[in-house]
Regions:
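Conserved catalytic cores of soluble enzyme domains
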Residues: 27-141
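Short, conserved loop/turn and helix-capping segments at secondary-structure boundaries
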Residues: 2-3, 37
């Protein structure tokens, strides 16, 4: 798992392209080997190299995104999209509830909850992700000089969150 991410980041750096990542899974399997734990550090270092090269790193959370994935590289994105209702967590709800000794809201650890607390920039249906990502990258990379407010409004009903996320 970690090797694939590191390879993808290196490919983005070598080709000077953005890195768009779709994390999905229960996390790095720490109990299987120390390699998984080491990969948390290695993937984080790879993302730092991407940032040193001033390349955008977009994360699109899918269901579920949990464990070591959220404890390392998934939360380091420049922009975070999430699918509606997806689980975004480090530890399970019961573990946290037992630790804090209080009842947690029913939407705890959902993309909506995480967005409300500032860790997700925008919730987007999967079918709309291509358009949203393309638009955002054209803004971030300033490559498409034809992008103007009229075109943006035709592409997206509500561009304010994208413009805010891009600034």
């Amino acid at each position: 798992e970690g090797e694939a991410i590191i390879y993808g980041v290196q490919h983005a750096i070598d080709n000077q392209t953005p890195f768009v990542f779709f994390p999905c899974g229960g996390g790095q399997r720490m109990f299987e080997s120390p390699i998984a734990l080491a990969n948390m550090t290695r993937t984080t270092l790879a993302i730092n190299e991407l940032k040193k090269n001033n390349l955008p790193y977009l994360v699109c959370f899918t269901d579920p995104t949990a464990g070591g994935i959220t404890a390392s590289f998934a939360m380091l994105g420049d922009i975070h999209f999430a699918e509606p209702g997806c689980l975004i967590a480090f530890a399970g709800k019961r573990v946290i509830q037992a630790t804090v000794k209080e009842e947690l809201s029913s939407d705890f650890q959902t993309s909506e909850f995480v967005e409300k607390h500032g860790f997700v920039d925008r919730i987007v249906e999967r079918k709309d992700l291509k358009t949203e990502i393309s638009l955002l990258l054209s803004i971030l990379l300033k490559k498409d000089n034809a992008v103007n407010e009229k075109q943006i409004n035709e592409t997206s009903d509500n561009i304010e969150p994208l413009a805010k996320a891009a600034s």
